[in-house]
């Protein structure tokens, strides 16, 4: 783009200088013709009479010719100076315009570079913030995982201690059909198991209050008793323990085998047919009341 602009300016200068060059040549030619024109010869009869005057006239003529020559030279030099001044002014304007465009391009380049650096800096900042957040999230997840592992280890340790405590209170033979009991601990253990079996569905808080234990202690004891086969059941999300006998479990297993694939919702709707959730104490009271009514009627 700069080369094209310089070429156009050069062509304009050449077109402007050519007419001036021809005009100057014509002026110089005229001046040379005027200088080269011979002086007019006076008649002979006037030579003797006006010899002194002729000499006097020649002097002004010569001086006039020299003055005209100097004027022509001055005019020519003045024209050349004007041409040179005009050409220099055009070149100066072209140089200024070129310098201005260069400065504008430099300013635009610096602005683009500053914008690019700012964008890169902002992207680096976002990347650093994202990396820090990822590290914080990973650290938090690792912390929660370690806390969960520690909690599980603590619960397992407490359950193991509770199991050892209960295991020390009774022993089971190889077949698991007989128990050796020592003192009142066996009575307490039997009461705990029978209470759960009779209630069928017992809140853990009520169970803890009944035996003067903490809720976590009740959970640990139930887990220990399940591990040795004394209890079988499930804990729901409402804090209740539901006792399920082996007969009821076998009935559910047989139903699943007969039906094949069974959904959980369907099995839950049919579970009431196999699992009795009514307390046995209430059944016993109902049977006793019915027996008393029959006796009174008879």
Curated annotation (Swiss-Prot):
Membrane-side (Cytoplasmic) residue stretches: 24-298
Residue ranges of the TM segments: 3-23
Region spans: Disordered: 31-155
Keywords: Endoplasmic reticulum, Membrane, Transmembrane, Transmembrane helix, Ubl conjugation pathway
Main location: endoplasmic reticulum
Residues in compartment: Lumenal: 1-2
Subcellular location: Endoplasmic reticulum membrane
Segments of skewed composition (Basic and acidic residues): 101-155
Presence of the UniProt keyword Transmembrane helix in the record: yes
Any GO CC annotation of this UniProt entry: cytosol
Record's bilayer topology term: Single-pass membrane protein
Similarity annotation: Belongs to the DDRGK1 family.
Cited function: Substrate adapter for ufmylation, the covalent attachment of the ubiquitin-like modifier UFM1 to substrate proteins.
PANTHER family (UniProt xref): DDRGK DOMAIN-CONTAINING PROTEIN 1
Protein name (record): DDRGK domain-containing protein 1
